[in-house]
C-alpha cells in the first residue's frame, strides 16, 4: 500500500509537486481559466505546497519557487491575471507570498491580511487596541505592486495568528491569551455574549480556532434572544466599527456574505451527514433572502447594519486618501483603547483622513497632540465624513463614543 498526505481533510489529497507532471498540469489549469477570461485566481493554502520530511511542511522555500514558476508562466501568456495568496500563517511569513521583488521573484499580487483580521478580533474580546496597535505597527511592508485583502470574516475559521512577541510586549502570555480568546468567542468566558464554536482543537500544540458568524461572535445572537436593546446596539456598533477599519486601512476590503445583514449562526448543517462533523458550516448557511428583505424596513437590525455599511462603502469610493499607495501612518496615542492612523492622498498632501476607532464599551478620549503634530486639528475642529458633522476638540481632546469611530478630514 501507499500513503497520501491530507493536511486538511481526508478527502483532500495534497499534490506531489516533486512530480513535474503535477506542476505542468496545475499550470495548464491556471492557463485554462485565464483563457476563459478569469481576471483573478485564488490559490488556496499556498504555504502548504511543498512537503519535506522532518519539517513542518509550511512556508518551505520550494513553495515560493513553485509560485514564481506559476506566475512566470502566467506573465508570458496572460499577464493581466492576478493571483490571491491564501496563506493563513504568521505575520512575518504572509508578506513573503507577494514575492521577493517585482521582477525576478514575483509571486502573488494580493494576499489575505489574516494578521489584521486576528488583531481586530483580539480588540473585540479585550475591549482595547493594545495588541492591535502593536501588531499593525509591526506588519511587514508589502511590495508597491501588491495589496492586502482586508476582511473581518470569511468562509473559514478564525485563526489567532498574531505574533507571539507582539503578545508578550502587550503584556500577555501568548498561549494563555489565545486560550482566553477561544474561551471568549465560544461563550465560556464569564460575561461573554459570543456564540462561536471551537474548531480544530489540537491537544498537542494547544491550537484551537473559532467558527461562527460575525453577528453571533459579537453578541448579536445573544442580544436578540434576550431582547436587550443596549446589547443589540453594542453588537451593531461593533459590526460597523470592524468594517470601518477594513474599509479605511488600505487594500481591498472583503465583505463576507450575510455580514451586511447580521446573519446569525445556523445549525442546518447538523442535518447533513457530509457536513455535521465540520462546524465551520455554522457560518456557511444558505443565504436568507427573507432576512435580506428586512434591510428595506426602517429600524430593523438588518436595515441598521446594511445602511451603515452601504454608506461607508460609498464614502470609501470617493475618498482618494483611502487608495492603497503605502500611505498609511499609525499614530501613537496615550489611550490603549484606540487605534488611530492617517491616510494621505499621494497627489495632494493636504487631502487626508484621520481614522480613529474606539474598541471600548465606554466613551474614550483622544488627545489631539499627536494628530496635531501631523497637521490635523490645526483649528481645533474637523469634519467627520460619516456623520457630516464637525468634531470639535475641547481642552486638546476629542471624545469618541463607545464602539465607534471617526473618519476625520479638514
How should each PLM-predicted stretch be described?
Residues 1-410:
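Active-site and adjacent substrate-binding regions of carbohydrate-active enzymes
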Amino acid at each position: 500500500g501507499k500513503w497520501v498526505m491530507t493536511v486538511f481533510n481526508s478527502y483532500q489529497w495534497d499534490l506531489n509537486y516533486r512530480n513535474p507532471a503535477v506542476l505542468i498540469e496545475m499550470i495548464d489549469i491556471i492557463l485554462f481559466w485565464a483563457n476563459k477570461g478569469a481576471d483573478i485566481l485564488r490559490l488556496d493554502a499556498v504555504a502548504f505546497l511543498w512537503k519535506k520530511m522532518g519539517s513542518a511542511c509550511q512556508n518551505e522555500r520550494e513553495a515560493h519557487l513553485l509560485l514564481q514558476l506559476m506566475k512566470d508562466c502566467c506573465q508570458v501568456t496572460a499577464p493581466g491575471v492576478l493571483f490571491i495568496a491564501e496563506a493563513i500563517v504568521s505575520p512575518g511569513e504572509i508578506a513573503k507570498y507577494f514575492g521577493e521583488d517585482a521582477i525576478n521573484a514575483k509571486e502573488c499580487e494580493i494576499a489575505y491580511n489574516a494578521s489584521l483580521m486576528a488583531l481586530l478580533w483580539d480588540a473585540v474580546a479585550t475591549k482595547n487596541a493594545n495588541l492591535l496597535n502593536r501588531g499593525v505597527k509591526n506588519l511587514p511592508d508589502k511590495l508597491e505592486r501588491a495589496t492586502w485583502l482586508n476582511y473581518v470574516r470569511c468562509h473559514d475559521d478564525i485563526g489567532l495568528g498574531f505574533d507571539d512577541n507582539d503578545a508578550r510586549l502587550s503584556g500577555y502570555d501568548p498561549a494563555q491569551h489565545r486560550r482566553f480568546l477561544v474561551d471568549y468567542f465560544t461563550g465560556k468566558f464569564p460575561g461573554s455574549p459570543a456564540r462561536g464554536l471551537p474548531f480544530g482543537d489540537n491537544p498537542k500544540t494547544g491550537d484551537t480556532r473559532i467558527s461562527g458568524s460575525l453577528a453571533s461572535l459579537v453578541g448579536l445572537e445573544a442580544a436578540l434572544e434576550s431582547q436587550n436593546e443596549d446589547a443589540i446596539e453594542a453588537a451593531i456598533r461593533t459590526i460597523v466599527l470592524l468594517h470601518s477599519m477594513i474599509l479605511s486601512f488600505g487594500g481591498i476590503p472583503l465583505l463576507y456574505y450575510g455580514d451586511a445583514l447580521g446573519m446569525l449562526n445556523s445549525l442546518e448543517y447538523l442535518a447533513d451527514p457530509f457536513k455535521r462533523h465540520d462546524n465551520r458550516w455554522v457560518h456557511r448557511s444558505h443565504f436568507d433572502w427573507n432576512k435580506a428583505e428586512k434591510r428595506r424596513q426602517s429600524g430593523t437590525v438588518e436595515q441598521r447594519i446594511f445602511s451603515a455599511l452601504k454608506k461607508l462603502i460609498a464614502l470609501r469610493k470617493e475618498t482618494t486618501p483611502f487608495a492603497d499607495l503605502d500611505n498609511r501612518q499609525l499614530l501613537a496615542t496615550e489611550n490603549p483603547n484606540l487605534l488611530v492612523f492617517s491616510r494621505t492622498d499621494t497627489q495632494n498632501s493636504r487631502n487626508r483622513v484621520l481614522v480613529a476607532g474606539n474598541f471600548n464599551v465606554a466613551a474614550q478620549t483622544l488627545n489631539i497632540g499627536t494628530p496635531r503634530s501631523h497637521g490635523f486639528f490645526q483649528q481645533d475642529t474637523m469634519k467627520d465624513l460619516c456623520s457630516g458633522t464637525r468634531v470639535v476638540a475641547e481642552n486638546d481632546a476629542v471624545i469618541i463614543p463607545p464602539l465607534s469611530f471617526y473618519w476625520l478630514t479638514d
